[in-house]
A protein has these predicted regions:
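Boundary at the C-terminal end of the N-terminal hydrophobic targeting segment
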Residues: 11-16
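Bacterial N-terminal signal peptides
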Residues: 1-9
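Active-site segments of SGNH/GDSL-like serine hydrolases
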Residues: 160-163, 178-211
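Conserved SGNH/GDSL esterase-like catalytic core that processes O-acyl groups on lipids
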Residues: 25, 46-170
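Short, solvent-exposed loop/turn and secondary-structure capping segments
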Residues: 64-68, 166-170, 194, 201-204, ...
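Active-site-proximal beta-strand/loop segments in catalytic clefts of secreted hydrolases
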Residues: 56-60, 156-161, 192-197, 226-231
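Catalytic His-Asp segment of secreted/periplasmic serine-dependent ester chemistry enzymes
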Residues: 197-293
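Loop/turn elements at helix/coil->beta-strand transitions in domains of secreted/extracellular proteins
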Residues: 49-52, 149-155, 183-190, 220-223
Length: 293
Protein backbone atom coordinates (compact mmCIF):
# COMPACT_ATOMS: atom_id res chain seq x y z
CA UNK A 1 0.00 0.00 0.00
CA UNK A 2 1.51 3.31 -1.03
CA UNK A 3 1.64 5.98 1.60
CA UNK A 4 -0.59 8.34 -0.34
CA UNK A 5 -3.11 5.61 -1.07
CA UNK A 6 -4.19 5.86 2.53
CA UNK A 7 -6.01 9.10 1.84
CA UNK A 8 -6.37 11.56 4.69
CA UNK A 9 -6.67 9.00 7.48
CA UNK A 10 -4.13 10.75 9.70
CA UNK A 11 -5.58 13.60 11.71
CA UNK A 12 -4.69 15.01 15.07
CA UNK A 13 -7.09 12.39 16.47
CA UNK A 14 -5.55 9.50 14.54
CA UNK A 15 -5.73 6.19 16.36
CA UNK A 16 -2.58 4.22 17.06
CA UNK A 17 -3.67 1.38 14.78
CA UNK A 18 -3.50 3.56 11.67
CA UNK A 19 0.24 4.22 11.85
CA UNK A 20 1.20 1.00 13.64
CA UNK A 21 0.20 -1.00 10.57
CA UNK A 22 2.36 0.96 8.13
CA UNK A 23 5.28 -1.14 6.80
CA UNK A 24 8.76 -0.80 8.23
CA UNK A 25 10.12 0.11 4.80
CA UNK A 26 7.94 2.51 2.82
CA UNK A 27 6.18 1.34 -0.30
CA UNK A 28 6.91 4.19 -2.67
CA UNK A 29 3.81 4.94 -4.70
CA UNK A 30 3.87 7.01 -7.90
CA UNK A 31 3.03 10.30 -6.16
CA UNK A 32 5.85 9.85 -3.65
CA UNK A 33 8.33 8.76 -6.33
CA UNK A 34 7.34 11.72 -8.50
CA UNK A 35 7.96 14.11 -5.62
CA UNK A 36 11.29 12.50 -4.75
CA UNK A 37 12.45 12.65 -8.36
CA UNK A 38 11.95 16.42 -8.26
CA UNK A 39 14.00 16.57 -5.05
CA UNK A 40 16.77 14.53 -6.68
CA UNK A 41 16.74 16.76 -9.77
CA UNK A 42 17.22 19.76 -7.48
CA UNK A 43 20.06 17.96 -5.74
CA UNK A 44 21.81 17.28 -9.02
CA UNK A 45 21.82 21.00 -9.74
CA UNK A 46 23.34 21.60 -6.30
CA UNK A 47 26.02 18.95 -6.80
CA UNK A 48 24.67 16.43 -4.30
CA UNK A 49 26.43 13.07 -4.17
CA UNK A 50 24.39 9.91 -4.92
CA UNK A 51 26.44 7.63 -2.64
CA UNK A 52 26.22 9.84 0.45
CA UNK A 53 23.58 10.03 3.17
CA UNK A 54 23.31 12.17 6.30
CA UNK A 55 22.20 11.19 9.81
CA UNK A 56 20.06 13.75 11.63
CA UNK A 57 18.67 13.20 15.11
CA UNK A 58 19.33 12.72 18.82
CA UNK A 59 21.34 10.20 20.85
CA UNK A 60 19.67 7.23 19.16
CA UNK A 61 21.17 8.51 15.91
CA UNK A 62 24.47 9.83 17.29
CA UNK A 63 25.20 6.54 19.10
CA UNK A 64 28.29 4.58 17.98
CA UNK A 65 25.92 1.62 17.67
CA UNK A 66 23.98 3.27 14.83
CA UNK A 67 25.62 2.35 11.52
CA UNK A 68 29.15 3.41 12.54
CA UNK A 69 30.58 -0.11 12.49
CA UNK A 70 29.42 -0.54 8.90
CA UNK A 71 31.95 2.11 7.94
CA UNK A 72 34.80 -0.37 8.08
CA UNK A 73 33.44 -3.75 9.23
CA UNK A 74 31.51 -6.41 7.36
CA UNK A 75 28.10 -7.22 8.81
CA UNK A 76 26.67 -10.69 9.14
CA UNK A 77 23.90 -10.26 6.61
CA UNK A 78 22.29 -13.65 7.11
CA UNK A 79 19.13 -13.74 5.00
CA UNK A 80 19.67 -10.13 3.88
CA UNK A 81 22.46 -10.70 1.35
CA UNK A 82 20.53 -8.68 -1.26
CA UNK A 83 21.50 -5.57 0.71
CA UNK A 84 25.20 -5.98 -0.05
CA UNK A 85 25.07 -3.81 -3.16
CA UNK A 86 23.46 -0.95 -1.27
CA UNK A 87 25.85 -1.41 1.65
CA UNK A 88 28.81 -1.02 -0.70
CA UNK A 89 27.23 1.79 -2.72
CA UNK A 90 26.84 4.07 0.31
CA UNK A 91 30.18 3.03 1.81
CA UNK A 92 32.37 3.86 -1.16
CA UNK A 93 32.16 7.66 -1.01
CA UNK A 94 34.51 9.45 1.38
CA UNK A 95 33.06 12.28 3.49
CA UNK A 96 34.62 14.73 5.97
CA UNK A 97 35.36 13.21 9.35
CA UNK A 98 32.88 13.99 12.08
CA UNK A 99 32.88 13.45 15.83
CA UNK A 100 32.80 9.66 15.61
CA UNK A 101 35.14 7.44 17.57
CA UNK A 102 38.33 6.58 15.70
CA UNK A 103 37.24 3.01 14.98
CA UNK A 104 37.48 3.36 11.19
CA UNK A 105 40.47 4.45 9.16
CA UNK A 106 38.09 5.88 6.56
CA UNK A 107 35.18 8.25 6.94
CA UNK A 108 32.02 7.53 5.01
CA UNK A 109 28.31 8.02 5.53
CA UNK A 110 28.10 5.10 7.96
CA UNK A 111 30.98 6.05 10.22
CA UNK A 112 30.40 9.81 10.29
CA UNK A 113 28.55 11.48 13.14
CA UNK A 114 28.10 15.04 12.01
CA UNK A 115 26.87 18.32 13.42
CA UNK A 116 23.16 17.44 13.15
CA UNK A 117 23.14 14.29 15.30
CA UNK A 118 23.56 15.23 18.95
CA UNK A 119 22.49 13.50 22.20
CA UNK A 120 19.59 15.23 23.91
CA UNK A 121 18.50 17.12 20.84
CA UNK A 122 14.93 17.88 19.84
CA UNK A 123 13.90 18.81 16.31
CA UNK A 124 13.98 22.49 17.19
CA UNK A 125 17.64 22.20 18.21
CA UNK A 126 18.60 21.08 14.71
CA UNK A 127 17.12 24.34 13.42
CA UNK A 128 19.30 26.56 15.61
CA UNK A 129 22.35 28.34 14.13
CA UNK A 130 25.73 26.76 14.82
CA UNK A 131 28.80 28.58 16.07
CA UNK A 132 31.08 26.01 14.47
CA UNK A 133 32.50 24.77 12.16
CA UNK A 134 33.58 28.14 10.78
CA UNK A 135 32.18 27.51 7.31
CA UNK A 136 28.70 27.07 8.79
CA UNK A 137 28.45 30.03 11.14
CA UNK A 138 24.91 31.34 11.17
CA UNK A 139 23.46 28.26 9.47
CA UNK A 140 21.06 25.86 11.19
CA UNK A 141 22.73 22.59 12.14
CA UNK A 142 20.74 20.72 9.51
CA UNK A 143 21.79 23.12 6.75
CA UNK A 144 25.41 22.92 7.90
CA UNK A 145 25.47 19.14 7.67
CA UNK A 146 23.90 19.25 4.23
CA UNK A 147 26.44 21.83 3.08
CA UNK A 148 29.34 19.73 4.35
CA UNK A 149 28.16 16.45 2.81
CA UNK A 150 25.92 17.23 -0.17
CA UNK A 151 24.03 13.98 0.54
CA UNK A 152 21.34 12.42 -1.61
CA UNK A 153 19.40 11.12 1.41
CA UNK A 154 18.97 12.16 5.05
CA UNK A 155 17.80 9.72 7.73
CA UNK A 156 15.89 11.82 10.26
CA UNK A 157 14.59 10.77 13.66
CA UNK A 158 13.48 13.16 16.38
CA UNK A 159 10.79 12.87 19.01
CA UNK A 160 12.24 10.88 21.90
CA UNK A 161 13.28 14.07 23.69
CA UNK A 162 10.63 16.31 22.13
CA UNK A 163 7.80 14.41 23.79
CA UNK A 164 9.06 15.54 27.19
CA UNK A 165 8.92 19.24 26.25
CA UNK A 166 6.39 19.80 23.47
CA UNK A 167 2.95 18.81 22.32
CA UNK A 168 2.70 16.46 19.35
CA UNK A 169 1.42 19.30 17.16
CA UNK A 170 4.32 21.58 18.15
CA UNK A 171 6.74 18.76 17.41
CA UNK A 172 5.25 18.15 13.99
CA UNK A 173 5.74 21.83 13.16
CA UNK A 174 9.45 21.60 14.00
CA UNK A 175 9.93 18.30 12.16
CA UNK A 176 8.21 19.80 9.12
CA UNK A 177 10.70 22.66 9.16
CA UNK A 178 13.59 20.19 9.30
CA UNK A 179 12.21 18.18 6.40
CA UNK A 180 11.67 21.35 4.34
CA UNK A 181 15.27 22.42 4.83
CA UNK A 182 16.43 18.99 3.72
CA UNK A 183 14.25 18.75 0.64
CA UNK A 184 15.00 22.34 -0.40
CA UNK A 185 18.68 21.33 -0.48
CA UNK A 186 17.87 18.56 -2.95
CA UNK A 187 18.22 15.80 -0.36
CA UNK A 188 15.53 13.17 0.21
CA UNK A 189 14.24 13.42 3.81
CA UNK A 190 13.36 10.04 5.33
CA UNK A 191 11.34 10.57 8.50
CA UNK A 192 11.17 7.83 11.11
CA UNK A 193 8.76 6.87 13.84
CA UNK A 194 10.27 6.76 17.31
CA UNK A 195 10.70 3.57 19.33
CA UNK A 196 8.34 2.41 22.07
CA UNK A 197 8.68 3.89 25.51
CA UNK A 198 6.63 1.62 27.75
CA UNK A 199 7.02 3.55 30.97
CA UNK A 200 4.17 5.92 31.77
CA UNK A 201 3.29 8.61 30.93
CA UNK A 202 5.34 8.24 27.76
CA UNK A 203 3.70 5.29 25.98
CA UNK A 204 0.60 7.26 24.98
CA UNK A 205 2.70 10.25 23.95
CA UNK A 206 4.80 8.02 21.69
CA UNK A 207 1.60 6.98 19.91
CA UNK A 208 0.51 10.59 19.42
CA UNK A 209 3.93 11.67 18.18
CA UNK A 210 4.18 8.74 15.77
CA UNK A 211 0.73 9.54 14.38
CA UNK A 212 1.96 13.08 13.66
CA UNK A 213 5.15 11.78 12.02
CA UNK A 214 3.07 9.50 9.78
CA UNK A 215 0.72 12.36 8.94
CA UNK A 216 3.64 14.59 7.99
CA UNK A 217 5.06 11.89 5.72
CA UNK A 218 1.71 11.37 4.05
CA UNK A 219 0.91 15.03 3.54
CA UNK A 220 4.37 15.90 2.19
CA UNK A 221 4.86 12.73 0.12
CA UNK A 222 7.93 11.69 2.13
CA UNK A 223 9.30 8.20 2.79
CA UNK A 224 8.34 6.98 6.28
CA UNK A 225 10.55 4.45 8.05
CA UNK A 226 8.35 2.78 10.68
CA UNK A 227 11.11 1.99 13.16
CA UNK A 228 8.54 1.62 15.95
CA UNK A 229 7.09 -1.42 14.20
CA UNK A 230 10.47 -3.14 14.10
CA UNK A 231 10.92 -2.67 17.83
CA UNK A 232 7.37 -3.64 18.78
CA UNK A 233 7.36 -6.82 16.70
CA UNK A 234 6.54 -10.11 18.46
CA UNK A 235 9.63 -11.91 19.69
CA UNK A 236 11.74 -8.80 20.26
CA UNK A 237 12.70 -8.82 23.96
CA UNK A 238 11.73 -5.69 25.91
CA UNK A 239 10.58 -4.05 22.68
CA UNK A 240 14.20 -3.75 21.61
CA UNK A 241 15.06 -1.36 24.43
CA UNK A 242 18.06 -1.34 26.74
CA UNK A 243 17.97 -1.14 30.51
CA UNK A 244 17.05 2.56 30.54
CA UNK A 245 13.85 1.86 28.63
CA UNK A 246 14.67 4.63 26.14
CA UNK A 247 17.59 3.65 23.91
CA UNK A 248 17.78 0.53 21.73
CA UNK A 249 19.58 -2.50 23.09
CA UNK A 250 22.86 -3.97 21.82
CA UNK A 251 23.97 -7.62 21.75
CA UNK A 252 26.73 -8.07 24.35
CA UNK A 253 29.03 -9.92 24.07
CA UNK A 254 30.27 -9.21 21.43
CA UNK A 255 28.55 -5.80 21.68
CA UNK A 256 27.83 -5.64 17.98
CA UNK A 257 24.90 -4.11 16.19
CA UNK A 258 25.64 -5.41 12.69
CA UNK A 259 24.67 -9.06 13.12
CA UNK A 260 21.50 -9.41 11.07
CA UNK A 261 20.99 -13.09 11.75
CA UNK A 262 17.96 -14.05 13.89
CA UNK A 263 19.79 -13.94 17.24
CA UNK A 264 21.26 -10.52 16.49
CA UNK A 265 17.90 -9.14 15.43
CA UNK A 266 16.55 -9.59 18.94
CA UNK A 267 18.39 -6.37 19.80
CA UNK A 268 17.20 -2.85 19.05
CA UNK A 269 20.27 -1.36 17.39
CA UNK A 270 20.68 -4.31 15.03
CA UNK A 271 17.04 -3.81 14.02
CA UNK A 272 17.70 -0.10 13.53
CA UNK A 273 20.78 -0.70 11.40
CA UNK A 274 19.01 -3.28 9.27
CA UNK A 275 16.04 -0.95 8.87
CA UNK A 276 18.30 1.87 7.70
CA UNK A 277 19.92 -0.36 5.09
CA UNK A 278 16.54 -1.58 3.87
CA UNK A 279 15.25 1.98 3.51
CA UNK A 280 18.38 3.07 1.66
CA UNK A 281 18.09 0.01 -0.57
CA UNK A 282 14.45 0.81 -1.41
CA UNK A 283 15.33 4.38 -2.34
CA UNK A 284 18.34 3.34 -4.42
CA UNK A 285 16.25 0.86 -6.38
CA UNK A 286 13.10 2.93 -6.91
CA UNK A 287 14.35 6.53 -7.10
CA UNK A 288 17.21 7.47 -9.47
CA UNK A 289 19.85 8.39 -6.90
CA UNK A 290 22.56 6.14 -8.27
CA UNK A 291 23.09 2.84 -10.04
CA UNK A 292 20.29 1.02 -8.26
CA UNK A 293 17.94 0.62 -11.21
Amino acid sequence: MALLALGSVFSHEASAAEWEELPVVPVLGPVVVGHLEKVVDRGERFGNRPGVFAKIGDSITASPSFLQALGCQSPRLGAWSELRGTLEFFGAAAVPRGSEEARCSVSNSYSRVGVAAVPGWRAVDALAPLESPPECQGLPAVSCELQLLHPSVALIMFGTNDLEDFSAVEFRRDLARVSRLVSSAGTIPVVSTIPPRPRQPFSQRVARFNAEIAALAENRALPLWNFWRQMAAPGVPDQGLGEDGVHPSVLCPPCTAIDFRPAGLRQGYALRNLGALRVLDRLRREVPIGDGR
